[in-house]
Curated annotation (Swiss-Prot):
SMART domains: FCH. It comes from Danio rerio (Zebrafish). GO terms for biological process: chordate embryonic development; clathrin coat assembly; clathrin-dependent endocytosis; convergent extension involved in axis elongation; membrane invagination; protein localization to plasma membrane; synaptic vesicle endocytosis. It comes from the Eukaryota. This is F-BAR domain only protein 2. The keyword Kinase does not apply. Keywords: Coated pit, Coiled coil, Endocytosis, Membrane, Phosphoprotein. The gene is fcho2.
Amino acid sequence: MITPYFLENFWGNKNSGFYVLYHNMKHGQISSKELSDFIRERATIEEAYSRSMTKLAKTASNFSQLGTFAPVWDVFKQSTEKLAACHMELVRKLQELIKEVQKYVDEQAKNHKKTKEEVASTLEAVHNIQSVSQALLKSKENYINKTLEQERMRKEGAKQGDLDKAGLKVKKATESYKSYVEKYATAKTEFEQRMTETAQKFQGIEEEHILRMQEIIHSYSLSVEETHIQIGEVQQEFVNNMENTSVESLIEKLAESRGTGKERPGPIEFEECNVSIATEGAKPRKRKTFAIPGRRKEKDTDSTESTEVEAVNASNGAPPGFYGAIDLHNANVPQLDDEGFCIRPEVNENDAKENSFYSSSDSEDEDEPRKFHVQIKPVQTNNGTHQHKVTIDELKASIGNISLSPTPAVHMKRNQSNDELARPKIPQPPLNDRFSSNDLLSLDPFGPTSTGSSSSLPQSSVPPPNRPTTPLGTSSIVPPPRPLSRPKLATGKLTGITESGRPFSPPKLLNSSPPPPAAPLARAESFSSLSSNTSLSASNTPTVEDDVFVGKLPTFEKRCETPAGTSRGPSPVTLASQDALPIAVAFTESVNAYFKGADPSKCIVKITGDMTLSFPSGIIKIFTSSPSPAVLSFKLLNASRLEQIMPNQQLLHSDSSQSDTNTKDFWMNMPALTSFLRKSSEQNPAASYYNVDILKYQVCSNGIQSTPLNLVVYWKCSRSTTDLRVDYRYNPEAMQPPAPLTNVQVLVPVNGGVMNMQSLPNAIWNAEQNKSLWKLSDISDKSENEGSGSLRAKFELSEGPSIPATLAVQFFSEGSSLSGVDMELAGSGYRLSLNKKRFATGRYMADC
């Protein structure tokens, strides 16, 4: 039992002990935060040291591997890597300890708040006794003064009336003084009771606080001690390895690995030449240029070769099968006639046929002339069904360094299917060109309304009536899919719009052939499993899912096929790279808005965004080869403007205890990130970079002030005509920094049997869908009237009046964001090579 020091030492004349104890309790919370900061700083130092040791291990692995000293570098490398792992393990333990400290800080704050409410009565008692004490002193002083004055007047012989008045004053002062004495006694009793309880409570809080702090410090010291023990074990292992690495063992390893053989050259004795055998007309047998050494014909298995012949062959100083070797056993000795001329042997045609290419069953022999049968077939057209073709790269790999001239043949991917070969290849323009060419007209906006999937478009090349004929773009053949990550408006804010949650989930492994490499930071669908469903109940309201808008406006998830041999992503990373690893980040935001009339207060806005990181393919080798790659950590700046942040729980960790609301700290789960990138590389090994969805967020909107383009719609409907006016105004304050709105398109449905349309500026009317379309150039503060303008149209009707409908607007912007959110790397080991920001419309509608 601890002595109640607080109860005995915090009284005093001024009764200020309560304030000292209360502020001491608050200082405990400050101490907890400072301890957390200290441990975090120690973890940062250990992490930096671990990264330095890892670099040192890589340096040791890059040293010369030649000579007898080469195996020693392996010992250095293994020991250094283990030391780096020990320090990284300490970092992990310290990070867990920081979480425990932060949890205690939160609990401590709650307990302090509860204690403050409990000691409120003690604070009142302190105020009461302090005020009563001051009043008592004043009353006592007044009583003394009045009494002395009465006594002075009596001595001076004052009048009786004055003495009576002085007596009354003394009497009142006496009564007041006595009453304050009684009040002080009551206040003192209550104060002592309250203060006793409070002092004991404060001491209990401090005892618990110090015990918790001691537990944290004990865990901290235990983690450091365990690390030191591990470091000692690694050091002892290093010493043992060096002791075992003796001079003899190093020389033995070199002899085993680089030795050239144990057989010494044998003696050679002089042998006389056998002239009788050498002059019998034996013909030397020479090897053909491409003959295989040591290969002999075994035609007569029953016959045995003479050992004498072998001795003669050996006496020539050349092994069997060597160039210039004389085969006396199979020597061709010509027959001579009477005059000394050679007799030409008769050639049997049947024997020639039997030994021909088609009928010979004999084994191949280098001594016999070889016939080749060449059959030239006519060139066949490529029908796309041959699966045994190989690429130029495979030919180069199989025949070595033989140079091949370029060929116009079709290059085929290794795992390309027959269907893919049979289909005609559609040329894909670069990403920027696709963005610029993705307008409504080039993509057949006025085709029949699709009732099926939103990704289907009419394939007919016949243009519908009452519409200018425009050549179809390449992307109209295969329309791009609807972006999976496009945010929706919140449920309940817009009638008919529903939204399903889109949590992060592990990436799906595709069974099909890997897709072509995506452009940097392009949202590759094979790396995302996010899904969402959105519907709009109003049938006359144009939406993003209508056939007019599917694939017409640019999205940020389109693929871009990179030609072979080109690279448009981050630079490749090599294992010997000692510099910071390059990564890229993209912020993609979507603004959804609904304007109702000219009242700004009725505008409903929802802004959502995604953050994506892009990693070069070379970084995967570094992650997988390193036992503890550098932890990627970053700060999310201007986070106070975000209403909600949803990080990828599988890949990202965050510190929820941060006091700074404008900055959020995050760090990657490196094993999970390495596993994800490795799986992505297995799916698409040809890609030079891989995109990873990091987090999603929702921006705090400020009504119409958060919309980049303000809209007001006016309808004037009569039986014969309908007048329409759409006022728009560019709002640069909604963007950071202000950027032009590109590819602005306005779609308005008009019913009532439109016979004729007059518009300013010119619009396109689709009689089949009863919709008018305006296509505007870029809108910015440098445009005419600083980005403000009007769209006017007059429609002549046959079945009027028209019913005012909801219009839809779409646009996008590059190089700017609506939230102002930014990202900053923390720590070392990585560098930001690209920071891309962009936003586009989701459901951007206006009504009268």
